[in-house]
Amino acid sequence: MTWLDQVLAEGEHAERMRSDLEHFARRALKLRPKAGMLEPFIFNAAQKKLHETIEAQRAKMGRVRVVILKARQLGISTYIAARLFHRTIYNPGLRTIIIGHEKRASSNLFQIVKRYYDNMDETIRPSIGISNAEELIFDKIDSGYIVTVATNEGTGRSATAQMLHASEVAFWTDLPSQMASLMQTVPDVDGTEIILETTANGFNDFQALWRKAEAGESEFMPVFLPWSIDPGYRREIDSDFEMDSDERALSHLYKLDAEQIAWRRAKISQLGSAERFPQEYPLVASEAFISSNFDSFISPDLVIKARREKVDPYGILIIGVDPAGSGDARTSIAWRRGRRIEKVESRRGLDTMQVCGWVRKIIREDKPVKVNIDVGGLPPNYCEAFALRFAAIAFPVSTAR
């Protein structure tokens, strides 16, 4: 190799280190895995999927806004730490904030970053100007980290950053107000990244945030990562291993093999509760929010069973209407035939007459036997408007509060 070839090769390597996170992680970063000892950071299946998803959003939108709902111990916080570390050391003037739900959690996340730094090759490691429990500043490039805890006193309000990692947001004490503060911390410009990640914590404010993301009603893209994506979540089986009926149904529905089912069975035994397992290790996003501590009218077991059951449509068509109260709220209509909801449609910004017109069109085209309208909390004139509109076509409409 000539000196010119060597210079070109070194230049290509440096550029790839800068532009390719997966290459950078494998070559420059060290992890301490569950078994101990440091080893190169090679993306696992969950990390690869998340990386591809985030990069696709960044290429399309110019910025990153994602909310991640995950099973436990998939290495997601480790990936996010690597991603933001890579951006921070290669972009002068960039600030990154790490926010955990409690002080110890924030400290643990910060230790991952410091381990990355301490074990890097000195030729690519930026010099440090400040290093303490709450800050890591790279002086010559004017980039660095701030570490804090989610509190009620305006999370991150006094800081300005371009990168933000918010961890275990389902366990934050006042998520709506804390999110309002955070959205002021990171400017709404290209090149910025806000990444929220968490395991579930029952029916709470995070569930509402997640549902909005799923419905496309927020700027955050939802990313769900089930436990089954991790090839390590398996257990060797004996020759006499047999699945029970529920396990066979799970295996068929989610394409799980016997070793995955065996791991699940052992983990349920460790947790001491089959109801707790889906919250810690969900297979679909919806079951993550089913908590054994939630005193619901319908038991979690029945909800999970219903979600897994395939029901063919049959019988008469009934329409359910949930009209918006006011403003830009959403009106939703469901088509039900027998025990199956065939579809749901939602529209925003409709007034009373527009909703009536929509329902009347459905009556004419789909010919339902009955329309049920939920008018709870709506003013009396709303109910009267429906009654007058549908009396003209002699159609039975039920309004229930």
Please place each PLM-identified region on the residue numbering.
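N-terminal accessory segments
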Residues: 1-65, 123, 340, 350-353
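Walker A/P-loop
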Residues: 60-84
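Conserved Walker A/P-loop ATP-binding site and its immediately adjacent core
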Residues: 94-115
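Inter-Walker segment of RecA-like/P-loop motor cores
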Residues: 108-162
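SF2 helicase catalytic motif II
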Residues: 162-174
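ASCE P-loop NTPase helicase motor core
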Residues: 171-256, 380-391
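Mg2+-dependent endonuclease catalytic cores in nucleic-acid-processing enzymes, primarily RNase H-like
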Residues: 201-216, 237, 337-401
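ATPase catalytic-site recognition across NTP-hydrolyzing enzymes
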Residues: 231-321
